[in-house]
Amino acid sequence: MKRIEVISLDRIGLVGEISNVIRRLNGNIITHTANVLTDEKNNLVSHFTADIHFETASEDETVSRRLRRIKNVRQVIISDL
């Protein structure tokens, strides 16, 4: 089981794009949260966190690289649970 955190500028459809990337990598989202805050420049920033079970072994770097390709993603953090 993995915990994935994605920090990005907020926009419509962001959670759907993140979910699609995870599904394409054979991941099942167990739980997730998405919060929107403002940064120091008053930009809306989304903080998406999900606990994921991958059906097949998945390299953290591959998952991170695919998530970073999403428009306006600033940071991806992956940790084991």
Region locations from a protein language model:
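A conserved regulatory-domain signal marking ACT and ACT-like small-molecule sensing domains
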Residues: 1-81
